[in-house]
A protein has these predicted regions:
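Structural marker of alpha-solenoid helical repeat scaffolds
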Residues: 12, 46, 63, 80-84
Length: 105
């Protein structure tokens, strides 16, 4: 579903974690990182156990140069993934955190 269609649903009063995740993912894919981060932040406010949303939130923040905020999102996402047994998200988030720790070349 397009971000336009999802935005229309939001404007009609639908607002939930899945809708916000869809918007965040759509905007992230479109390189609209600030909008992506806004929707993904709302997503994790709806559902703090949504490890995939924490992962994407970290990406959106990192793409804006907000590495400290990205690290915080990924660390929270890693905690959630480990608590839920979400091994795939945990592995992906661990890779992002390691990349963040590497010095820039």
């Amino acid at each position: 579903m397009s971000t336009e269609a999802l935005e229309k649903m939001l404007a009609k009063g639908m607002d939930n974690a899945l809708l916000r995740f869809g918007l965040g993912k759509g905007y992230l894919d479109a390189s609209e990182f600030a909008k992506a981060a806004e929707h993904l932040q709302r997503c994790v406010e709806f559902d703090a156990q949504y490890s995939a949303a924490w992962k994407l939130l970290g990406q959106a923040l990192n793409k804006q140069g907000l590495s400290a905020e990205a690290r915080a999102a990924w660390q929270q996402g890693l905690r959630v993934a480990e608590e839920k047994g979400d091994k795939q998200a945990g592995k992906e988030i661990s890779v992002f955190l390691k990349r963040l720790d590497k010095p820039a070349r």
